[in-house]
């Protein structure tokens, strides 16, 4: 960070500081390049993915991987990856734009395949891999030649991921780690060539390994029969004396939590952005139907109850949109302060996202619950037709339910939000305790509101912050 640059706000700073319009990122600040990429991805989603939705939902592996590799040819699998490894290394704002635009494809299954490939299936290697690991795996992942998967969850370790029983012991000759255990609900598993597997070294050191599909001792189980996202692959992965070369240890022994949670932070954010795109697509279908469906000699869009649902959907979508792009703007500011020439640049990048783990969890909760609400309203607006598979609500209604479970359940993400606030208050990283000590005066004084538009609304927002802090 140079002397002329102001410090980047820590996650949660919005609770103790007024809005800073100079650093508040919104979609209105997209560059021309951002808009060009947005159009390209939307066109791909509408022309290549959506027309093939039915085939993709039948778990057509050949079609899904063909489309994924087409995205690779467009450079869309390597947005975060340096050119040296075949990527484009665009900014983090672009990752949000692409995720949102793919969410409009009306194929949650394909969006899941894409999201895992470019997120938790690739970022651990990019952020924490050795030069040799990056050279071996990233060029294959960014083209779609190889498919990535992320093996963290176990039958007895879901939300409590660090309690996993999968073990790793060093072989007598010191050349291999022998992995034993079972992983559950692994997305992309049946198609994956590379698994990021988490295991306890010597029973207590949570670590990560890059495990190739051809590794002796690794077996992919049968496909799960799921409620939704039926076109994606979800299988258990069993490891029995799986021989993983010591060179495939990712980062360091005992650093698995750092890898897991940094990858999940951005994964949660990307899921939120994808859900935002899905919400907008469902909203458009619901409004289109309401304007065309006539009952009692008029379009049902004229009825106040339908207008109320449309308004509720629009409010939630706007709130999610604002939160998501404000958060990615903060992450981008933090990344911009890093030195790309630093040997640990990508480790620092992962750590930069951790600064906003709270906001990523908030975005995940708001994004997934917005899509759930919007889809539910969409079904209701379509009435009986909303329950019929040929109409555009039944599939999304099933598909969206998983978004409140994976990438950390929404209950766990709410705990992360509350825990982060408490932790940063105790460590005095945020001046929350200082303000709480003066709580009487803090509540008695009227909050000052800046001039200009929305004066009353800004004052109400600041008052709301004071009220929230008073509860602490």
Go through the PLM ranges and name each one.
Residues 1-115, 128, 132-136, 140, ...:
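Amphipathic, small/basic residue-rich leader segments at the start of a protein or domain
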Residues 2-3, 9-11, 43, 47, ...:
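Alpha-helix capping/hinge segments and adjacent helical runs
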Residues 27-30, 219-321, 361, 402-406, ...:
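Glycine-rich beta->alpha junctions and the first turn(s) of the following alpha-helix
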Residues 50-58, 295, 318-366, 379-382:
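C-terminal helix-coil-helix/basic helical segment that borders enzyme active sites and/or dimer interfaces
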Residues 144-152:
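A short, Trp-centered hydrophobic/proline-enriched beta-strand micro-motif
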Residues 157-158, 184-190, 266, 402-407:
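Glycine-rich phosphate/pyrophosphate-binding beta-alpha loops
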Residues 166-170:
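A structural signal for short hydrophobic beta-strand segments in well-ordered beta-sheet cores
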Residues 175-220:
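A short core secondary-structure module
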């Amino acid at each position: 960070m140079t002397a002329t640059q102001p410090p980047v706000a820590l996650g949660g700073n919005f609770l103790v500081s007024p809005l800073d319009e100079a650093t508040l990122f919104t979609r209105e600040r997209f560059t021309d390049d951002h808009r060009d990429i947005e159009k390209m991805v939307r066109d791909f989603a509408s022309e290549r993915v959506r027309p093939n939705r039915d085939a993709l939902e039948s778990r057509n592996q050949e079609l899904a991987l063909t489309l994924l590799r087409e995205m690779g040819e467009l450079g869309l699998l390597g947005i975060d990856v340096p050119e040296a490894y075949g990527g484009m290394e665009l900014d983090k704002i672009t990752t949000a734009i692409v995720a949102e635009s793919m969410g409009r494809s009306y194929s949650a299954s394909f969006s899941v395949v894409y999201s895992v490939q470019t997120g938790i299936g690739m970022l651990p290697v990019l952020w924490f891999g050795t030069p040799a690991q990056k050279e071996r795996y990233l060029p294959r992942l960014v083209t779609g030649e190889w498919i990535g998967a992320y093996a963290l969850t176990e039958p007895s370790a879901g939300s409590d991921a660090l309690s996993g029983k999968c073990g790793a012991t060093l072989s007598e000759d010191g050349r291999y780690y022998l992995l034993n255990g079972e992983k559950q609900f692994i997305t992309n598993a049946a198609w994956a060539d590379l698994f990021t597997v988490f295991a306890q070294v010597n029973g207590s050191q949570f670590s990560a390994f890059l495990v190739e599909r051809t590794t002796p001792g690794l077996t992919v189980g049968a496909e799960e029969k799921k409620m939704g996202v039926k076109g994606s692959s979800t299988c258990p992965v069993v490891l029995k004396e799986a021989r993983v070369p010591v060179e495939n240890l990712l980062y360091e022994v005992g650093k698995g939590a750092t890898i897991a949670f940094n990858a999940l932070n951005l994964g949660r954010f990307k899921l939120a952005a994808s859900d935002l795109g899905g919400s907008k697509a469902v909203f458009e279908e619901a409004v289109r139907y309401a304007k065309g469906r006539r009952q009692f000699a008029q379009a049902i869009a004229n009825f106040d109850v339908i207008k109320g649902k449309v308004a509720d959907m629009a409010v939630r979508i706007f709130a999610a949109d604002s939160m998501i792009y404000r958060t990615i703007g903060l992450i981008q500011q933090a990344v911009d302060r890093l030195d790309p020439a630093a040997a640990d640049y990508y480790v620092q990048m992962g750590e930069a996202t951790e600064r906003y783990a709270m906001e990523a969890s908030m975005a995940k909760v708001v994004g997934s619950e917005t899509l759930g609400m919007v889809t539910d309203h969409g079904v209701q607006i379509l009435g009986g037709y909303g329950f019929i598979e040929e109409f555009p609500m039944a599939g999304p209604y099933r598909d969206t339910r998983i978004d409140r479970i994976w990438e950390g359940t929404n209950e766990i993400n709410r705990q992360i939000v509350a825990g982060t606030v408490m932790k940063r208050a105790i460590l005095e990283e945020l001046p929350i305790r200082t303000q709480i000590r003066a709580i009487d005066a803090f509540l008695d004084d009227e909050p000052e509101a800046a001039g200009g538009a929305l004066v009353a609304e800004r004052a109400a927002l600041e008052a709301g912050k004071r009220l929230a802090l008073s509860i602490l």
